[in-house]
Amino acid sequence: MKHPIHVTSEIGELQTVLLKRPGKEVENLTPDYLQQLLFDDIPYLPIIQKEHDYFAQTLRNRGVEVLYLEKLAAEALVDKKLREEFVDRILKEGQADVNVAHQTLKEYLLSFSNEELIQKIMGGVRKNEIETSKKTHLYELMEDHYPFYLDPMPNLYFTRDPAASVGDGLTINKMREPARRRESLFMEYIIKYHPRFEKHNVPIWLDRDYKFPIEGGDELILNEETIAIGVSARTSAKAIERLAKNLFSRQNKIKKVLAIEIPKCRAFMHLDTVFTMVDYDKFTIHPAIQGPKGNMNIYILEKGSDEETLKITHRTSLMEALKEVLGLSELVLIPCGGGDVIASAREQWNDGSNTLAIAPGVVVTYDRNYVSNTLLREHGIEVIEVLSSELSRGRGGPRCMSMPIVRKDI
């Protein structure tokens, strides 16, 4: 293949996508640690897996190649030294409990096959799994009720956030919250060492070592020349500025970056929870991100006089800013929940705006958001509904659960 990663729009026909099937990490959630691990509730594993399998099969039925993060990660770690390096970094970044010797935990993890190793790291390591030597130190004798040496990673089924495909390259992201920080490490090793990617020198527009956070749920590819990025609870304006400078200096296709400011709260976690593209001239939107007169802060970033300078233009109308950068005379913003104050809040909480376009005018949505789905159909959009009772407990929808790897150009 010429380019193992190629995404130049939000709506081009989806050809290859990366998913993560929910696993043991979901069962390692408990009420005491929900907030720390960024969950509001505990999904029921057998049903969330059934729903995720239905989602994956829905994509396959439309001709999409489905890849799995856990499988690619296991296939990337064929070298013994690479496995050890990966485990060392996971333990360091996961701030594994220092009351057990680092080497003991490392040896335990390395005793598994590659597939089991990845599942164990993702699922977390409980303290009752490892026998430690006789307790001789005070810190060892002190009672500790925290159950994990290595925390589970229940947010991993939202593959959209740790990395994002942009053109023929990608961003490998620094996640804002400590509970998700390790997630992008999997993608770093996959891109560097998996046979599908390693020989292609895939451009990394921004890597996970950059000091300010950015997450894929805030990165939307509007067309070949324009991307939109949310300034949100999870993505920093400084990271957006750095990414824009890197893009403008290292490639010549993307010419504009829209920085769209949204309220910084859990309900509006990323831009794609309140705004997604569903057709050439149609978008879903949660009305609450706009002011009383539809006003909001949008900044158009373009290349400046040199590599470290940007031209920044302020706009206050999302509709007008989109028309300007997309070269459209008209476009439609479809309100989540039909704009009804109750329905829009309820359906946005269950990701009514978080659509996954698999072709122009064809989207995958959660079945529970019936008001928004009906409105999409009334606007000529083909809506493919998927099961959502347990998947939605993680506060992410079909777009959140998928990382496009290859789309056809539009």
Swiss-Prot record:
One of its GO terms (cellular component) is cytoplasm. InterPro entries: Arg_deiminase. Its EC number is 3.5.3.6. Gene3D superfamilies: Arginine deiminase, L-arginine/glycine Amidinotransferase, Chain A. Pfam families: ADI. The active site is at C400. Keywords: Arginine metabolism, Cytoplasm, Hydrolase. NCBIfam families: arcA, PRK01388.1. Pathway: Amino-acid degradation; L-arginine degradation via ADI pathway; carbamoyl phosphate from L-arginine: step 1/2. GO terms for biological process: arginine catabolic process to ornithine; arginine deiminase pathway. This is Arginine deiminase. It is found in: Cytoplasm. HAMAP family: Arg_deiminase. It is an enzyme of class 3 (hydrolase). It catalyses: L-arginine + H2O = L-citrulline + NH4(+). The keyword Cytoplasm applies.
